[in-house]
Amino acid sequence: IFIFIFGLKENKNIYWFLLPFIFGFAFLSKQVPAAYILISLLIVLLYNSFFNDKKTNIKIFSLLLISSLIFIFLLILVLNLNGIPINSFVQQYILYPLSIGQSRVGSYEINLENFFLKYKLIHIFLIPYFLINILKIFRIKNYYKNFNFFLFLIIFLSVISLIFHQLLTKNQNFIFFLIPLLAALIHIETTKKKKKIVIISLIFLLCFFST
């Protein structure tokens, strides 16, 4: 995620070239939520492409394509050197996780209680962060194509992806690390407010008692 953020902010070739390798290794180590995060970032990348010039978009997508092909080539090479059939790899890393995911999605009911109330401590910070940035669209000219708005989309979609992953896996809760992260982002947004001391104190108390 950080590599992607740096790529959007600085638009350096090295970040776009490294991104497929980073996500490739992430996918190999843990298919989900890596796949969910990848989908979220692709949405932001496509949204960002609407505001880039043609030359910039060609450069970004060319680097991503070349890097992805190199990673796939190296992966196939490693599999062949170790005598691992490609079909076995596809079955183990792609088809099998998909079958598990489909069965869990089909048998699990996502409703208001599961999605919001179960993780209400995260939403206490996520909802204000969402509203602050949506209001900025109306208050700040062209904010919807500003880097800060792209950053908001990355954070928001990533949080939603992690919550969705947590609901499906039903493993030990690990996403509560998002609380101090979201608290810090709200803190940054409120540093120029008149009653910032009160707001910061409230954020600190909520963060302290929720974690």
Language model: regions and residue ranges:
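Transmembrane-embedded, aromatic-rich helix segments that form part
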Residues: 31-47, 128, 175-179
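Short hydrophobic alpha-helices at membrane interfaces in multi-pass membrane enzymes
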Residues: 3-25, 54-66, 145-157, 197-200
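Hydrophobic/aromatic-rich transmembrane helices and adjacent perimembrane loops
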Residues: 35-36, 167-198
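Perimembrane helix-loop-helix junctions
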Residues: 36-69, 140, 184, 188-192
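Hydrophobic, aromatic-rich transmembrane alpha-helices
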Residues: 120-147, 158, 183-187
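Membrane-lumen/periplasm interface segments of specific transmembrane helices
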Residues: 61-104, 162
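Signature aromatic-anchored transmembrane alpha helix within multi-pass, membrane-resident enzymes
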Residues: 66, 192-211
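Membrane-interface alpha helices of multi-pass inner-membrane proteins
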Residues: 15-33, 37-42, 70, 156-166
